[in-house]
């Protein structure tokens, strides 16, 4: 489904890779960020955690829209407005990893990917703003790396992008992409917005409440 004047999309994310993927899918969209305390939400299973976080982000953005007048504009409009929120964690050796908070943590995370594979668990939630219909799902992918040299690890930490992604896992970066041995799943899932799942949820969000 291509973007049209009757469909308005809001991407509730500050992630550059999610913006890139949604653009690749042929959609035009506006951006709003949730600004929530992600560490305040805890779940034992990674699948439950990422779905809960996507819902929390949607709640925060809808409240923001209510306060700034966007919600009234949407309700009065003939257009369908969909809000897309997403979250992702990395699971490595059975441990859930979110964004690294220190250089030491980032170093430990990235070096670990030389020893055993990482799994990405990513959620997508599409909220039909006018009807309140919500459709969510999650997707999983696995990433296998060759040995990541210490020099690459230090360059990534110095550059800083690793602190903005789950598990400090960057597969599309020029320094790390040559070191990826295999991906089981899709690259867009690893990057935080699985295209097939997103398309499915967009279609489903048009259903009756």
Where are these regions (language model features)?
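Anionic-ligand binding patches
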Residues: 2-10, 23, 47-209
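Cofactor-binding loop segments of dinucleotide-utilizing enzymes, especially the Rossmann-like FAD-
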Residues: 14, 34, 129
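Generic detector of contiguous secondary-structure segments
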Residues: 13-16, 41-44
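Short glycine-rich, Thr/Ser-proximal phosphate-binding strand/loop in the N-terminal lobe
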Residues: 26-43, 134-140
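NAD(P)+-binding Rossmann beta1-loop-alpha1 motif at the extreme N-terminus of oxidoreductases
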Residues: 9, 16-28
């Amino acid at each position: 489904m291509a973007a049209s004047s009757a469909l308005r999309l809001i991407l509730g994310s500050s992630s550059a890779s999610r913006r890139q993927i949604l653009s690749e899918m042929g959609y035009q969209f506006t951006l709003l960020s949730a600004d929530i305390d992600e560490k305040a939400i805890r779940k034992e299973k990674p699948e439950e955690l990422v779905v809960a976080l996507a819902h929390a982000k949607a709640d925060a953005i809808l409240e923001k829209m209510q306060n700034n007048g966007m919600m009234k504009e949407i309700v009065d409009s003939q257009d369908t407005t969909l809000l897309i929120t997403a979250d992702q964690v990395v699971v490595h050796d059975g441990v859930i990893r979110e964004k690294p908070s220190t250089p030491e943590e980032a170093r430990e995370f990235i070096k670990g990917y030389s020893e055993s594979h990482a799994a990405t668990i990513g959620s997508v939630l599409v909220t039909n703003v006018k009807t309140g219909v919500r459709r969510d799902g999650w997707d999983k992918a696995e990433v296998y790396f060759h040995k990541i040299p210490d020099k690459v690890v230090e360059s990534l930490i110095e550059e800083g992008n690793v602190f903005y992604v789950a598990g400090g896992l960057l597969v599309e970066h020029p320094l790390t992409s040559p070191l990826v041995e295999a991906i089981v799943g899709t690259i867009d899932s690893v990057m935080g917005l699985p295209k097939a799942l997103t398309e499915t949820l967009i279609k489903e969000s048009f259903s009756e409440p």
